[in-house]
Each structure stands twice: as C-alpha cells, then as structure tokens.
Amino acid sequence: MAAVAAATRWHLLLVLSAAGLGVTGAPQPPNILLLLMDDMGWGDLGVYGEPSRETPNLDRMAAEGMLFPSFYAANPLCSPSRAALLTGRLPIRTGFYTTNGHARNAYTPQEIVGGIPDPEHLLPELLKGAGYASKIVGKWHLGHRPQFHPLKHGFDEWFGSPNCHFGPYDNRARPNIPVYRDWEMVGRFYEEFPINLKTGESNLTQIYLQEALDFIKRQQATHHPFFLYWAIDATHAPVYASRAFLGTSQRGRYGDAVREIDDSVGRIVGLLRDLKIAGNTFVFFTSDNGAALVSAPKQGGSNGPFLCGKQTTFEGGMREPAIAWWPGHIPAGQVSHQLGSVMDLFTTSLSLAGLEPPSDRAIDGLDLLPAMLQGRLTERPIFYYRGNTLMAATLGQYKAHFWTWTNSWEEFRQGVDFCPGQNVSGVTTHSQEEHTKLPLIFHLGRDPGERFPLSFASTEYLDALRKITLVVQQHQESLVPGQPQLNVCNPAVMNWAPPGCEKLGKCLTPPESVPEKCSWPH
C-alpha cells in the first residue's frame, strides 16, 4: 500500500505540474466537482443498461472517463450518507444514527435537534488548506439549527435548502422549508420557489444549474482552485422537472427529471471545456442512496438487477451509479471493479489537493487515485449499517447478511413496500431476522439480486465466512461510536424563523419547546 501511495503521489505531482503553474511557480491542484444525486438508482443511466438510453451526456462522461459498477452509499438513507461523504467516516462514527429502536433508519427532518458535530472535519474545511474556494448547491441535510449551517463547516457559499423539498405545509403545524443564499433565507419551497405537485413542474433544477455555472465562471477568473458540491434533489419524491423537460421521457415524470439532470451535467461539462479547464477539473457523479422503490413506478427509479431499494441494506438500497471524469488523466472508457464508497470522495479529494486526511481519527474512505490513474485495486470491506446495527458486509464478491429486514408487517399491510415485486423467501423479511450465527452469504458476481444464498455446508461458504468474520471483528473491536445525533426531536426547532426571515416578512412563531424521542418506524 505504501508503494502504491508513493507512486500515486509522484504521478499526481507530474499531473499537477503539467496542468499549470501559478505565479509563484507552484503547481495548482485540480478543481473538484462532486455531483451528488438524490435517490437516483444504479439502473437509471443508459451506460448502466437503462433501456430508453435517455442520458447521453452522462453516458459520454463514462465513455470519456471511468465507470465504477461496484460503488456504494455509506447508508441506505440521505442524511447519514451525506455526512459520510463530507467526513470520510461511517455514520456510526459521526453520530448520524439513532438508538431509538433496533436497526432503525434515521435522518434530519425539520424537528431533529441534532446535526453534524463540531469536532468533525468536513471536506471544504480541509480543502481551505490548499487554497480552495467552495460552494454547496442544493440539499445540505446535516442539521437545520444555526450551529449546523454549512458556512460554519467550511463552505464559502451556499444556495439551497437544509432539507428536501417536502411539503407544502400550512406554516402553522409545520413551516415550509426555507431556501438559503449563504447565511440567510431567500424564500421557502412552495412559496417563492414553487413546485406544482399536480403537473410536476418546477424550475429548481435550472436554478441550481445556473448557480453552478456562475460559480465556475467566477472562480475560473480568479485562477484559484475551487470545490463545487452540487447536491440537487430532483429525483427525490415528489419528483419535479422544468416545463421544457416535462413529458419528454419514455419513463414518465421520473424520467423527465433524469433527462433534465443529464442535460444539466452536459452543460456543466461543456462550460469546463469552453473555459479550457476540463483538463484541470476532476468530476465525480454518484447518488446518496438507491432509488426509492416505495415511490415507484411514477416517482421512483431503477436499481437495475439489484434487490430492493432505498431504506434497505440489500444491494438496491446502497449500490450507486458512479462515474469519474478527468480528461487527460483518467484513461477514457475504463471500468474499475474497485469496491468504492461515497466516503472515498473525501479522501480522494484531499489527495487531489495534495493534503493528508486527519490523523487523529479513523477515516473509512480510500484514496481512489490508484484505481483511477493506474488501474490498481485495493481490497477493502463495505459495511452496511441500519442505525447502529451492522446488517451486512461485503468483501470481494461475497456479501454476508447478519440481519435481514425490509420494513414492518404493519407498514407493509398499509402499502409501504421497499421491495415491490421482489419478495425473496427467507431473504426479504418484514420482521427483523437475525443471522449472526450463520449469516446468509451471496456471491454478488453470480447472484447480484441476492436470491440464492450459498449452502452453509459448502467450502465456498465456509471460506467466505472466515474472511468476512475476521474483517468484521477487526472493525467492531476498534469502533468508537459517535454520540447519536438523531434521537431527539422538538417541534420548536423547525424552520419557523430562519436567519433573514425578518427582511422578507416571513418569520413564524414557534410552538412551545417539547423535546421528545424521535419515532423511526423502519
């Protein structure tokens, strides 16, 4: 590993030197664009086999860059996965989990009291050490209260929202969610930023696109490196698209949203080419978790051959589309079978900037540059957590399930189904089933749909079990969980009076403060 890292650093030094020198003669590190989608599935892109082939720009990105077919979210739900991307650490370490029930998914609704803890070092904070200017466009989702604001955690600019575009609300029992520019709100969803739930029309993706284009143009003129985290939420239900894209897809409204995203990515990449900075800009496209099959077929995407979707620790819940693009550096048209994670984007971005990850804490993200630049593969596990429960682990081609659960029988009988049409006897369960003594093990190469567990008596099973058990033991013995952030809710902390509401005349009166345990049903 040391030799690989040294070789990668040497290669990167040559790359940076070739990319351009600043006035002092020091090489300038590349710009970094992380494009994070919301609830987009592995099977939603043409390059991943989506039959309508309506993503020409993303497909071209893959043809000019590198595809990662085995790339994972850090959690099957939005907030924990986003915290992991920006810290390089599993959500169990940063406190993005709940202990209010066994194996419960949790996130950051308006009433959540917690958020990203101050001791965590976020990627934009660290990139400042290499002179990067940074902006987040879109969904933050790491806490609503003022102390969790993204500009307090390293970002220089923000246009977007602390949550998804849920609503509309009546502003009495629950306020509509604010949209911020930097420190202050500039309106609310369904008010200044309309979304027509009947037609699906909203101009939000175009607004987010323009924010990205304007930032890139401004930063290019400064000749300093920049970091853009473009975290839009268009494919999260309720799905929306602008008028020009509505009705243009063979896949309905969800496909319209995907087409608009594809067009937006094409325009961003086109601008990089026009400004002649494509060769000095690293771009990575992925999603925060699997497609929400519970919203399908009209409001949910495709997870391809994989089982179930968002909220579950089956492959469909956590395996993501992933494309790396860096012309002249990442060889074109390549497929990497490196097991990757959104946490790797933290470590890889630091490596691109010539920085080391913090040494005072466990970092779970790998540097993907050896895989991207040299085709080298690093063996590493993928851990699948639901709350503070380790549900499964993958090593190589083998995945072991220690617990299985989709969602409760009560919810299922009410029509909530995270695996519609995909029931696998003994695998997809509506009660929490423990397999810690004899895990269910699947070979994901032969059986990506997790339908045929290996025989407990087979040599293949025993060999895979031995290797995975060792890795899991090492992980659990050294694990120091963070203080849980997603246990306490309080209606008084919702977005009643965000900063800037006075200027707009949009301050609302909060209710009495009543802290209580958050209820997480699945």
Swiss-Prot record:
One cellular-component annotation, GO: lysosome
Q: Name one GO molecular function term.
A: metal ion binding
- Disulphide-bonded residues: 308-419, 489-518, 501-507
Subunit structure, interactors included: Homodimer.
Q: Where in the cell is it found?
A: Lysosome
Question: What family is it from?
Answer: Belongs to the sulfatase family.
Q: Does the keyword Transferase apply?
A: no
Which cofactor is essential here?
Answer: Ca(2+)
| Name the UniProt record assigns to this protein | N-acetylgalactosamine-6-sulfatase
